[in-house]
Amino acid sequence: MWSKIQGADMWVHIPDGCWPDRADELDPLVRPGFDSAARVTLPKFGAVLRERLAIEDAIADVFDSVDVLATPTTAIPAFAAEGPMPREINGRRVHAGMSVPFAMLANIWGSPAISVPAGTTADGLPVGLHLMADRHREDVCLRLARVLERARPWPLGARR
């Protein structure tokens, strides 16, 4: 669902005459979203939007009873910055974006979110804590992140 919504949104920003002539300039992770969105019919897009609204309603229900959702920043340990994003998690093939499912949830909902350092794995890889607040409550994310970072500051230098 997310790739179709994101792909449709990207189409809004493409100047006429740029697609597909410049498709090779897109990141390999981004291009499938464009290709997928180009094939989505209006009825299918309507179904995707209804699915998004159902997710938004479910998230709104959660924020009726909590101020913050705290989750891992990623679903897996850190991977190389130059990529690619992993295509397998716990032996199961997944869309590359599923390494960051909680960020995707915040993007669908349109809510503020922030990631703060939370320690390291047994192998010394960084682990983040993802904080997500209700819509228009950036102050909640920022205040909590400030408290957490003051309590456990991240080291300023890299270690080997």
What are these regions (language model features)?
Residues 1-8, 85-87, 129-131:
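Short low-complexity, flexible loop/linker segments enriched in glycine and/or proline
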Residues 4-60, 76, 115-118, 122-125:
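Short helix-loop capping/hinge segments that flank enzyme active sites or metal/cofactor-binding pockets
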Residues 5, 47, 79-100:
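Short, surface-exposed loop/helix-turn segments at secondary-structure junctions
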Residues 46-47, 57-60, 65, 107-160:
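Structural helix-boundary/capping segments
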Residues 60, 84, 103:
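Short glycine-/small-residue-rich flexible loop motifs, especially phosphate/cofactor-binding loops
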Residues 77-78, 138:
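Short, acidic Gly/Pro/Ser/Thr-rich loop/turn segments
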Residues 100-103, 135:
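Glycine-rich phosphate/pyrophosphate-binding beta-alpha loops
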